[in-house]
C-alpha cells in the first residue's frame, strides 16, 4: 500500500527540481543509489520496470525506503499495462509512471488513490489523460518533442 496520498505525491513532485529515473538488477546497488539521492535532498524517486525481477528489487527498495528514507516517495516507472501496475501498487508504489497513456492503468491507479503519470506525445493524449483524471503527464519522448512542446 502506498505511504503517500495522490495529493501528497503531486505536491512532492511540484517541489523537486529533478526526479531520478533508475534501474539496477542488484537490490544492494539500487539501495545505495537511493540512499545517495536521499542524502542529496531527493524526495521523489522513480525505479523503472526494465529488467528481469525488477519487481523483486522494487519490493526490497520499498522496505528500505520505508525504514531509511521515510519522507521519500518511491514510484514505479516504465509501466505499460494494468497487471504490472497492479503488481507494483500491491508492493507499495507511491506513484506509477508510464511511457504511454493506458486508460486501464489510469483507472487502476485512480481506484487506489495513487498518482499515475503517463507519457504523452500529443495534445490529444494529454487531453485524454486529463479527462480520465491524470493531474500530471510527462512529455515523452522528451528528446523528440523538446521543451518547446
Model-derived regions, located:
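Conserved N-terminal beta1-alpha1 strand-loop-helix module at the mouth
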Residues: 1-83, 87-91, 111
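Conserved anion-binding
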Residues: 53, 69, 83, 89-149
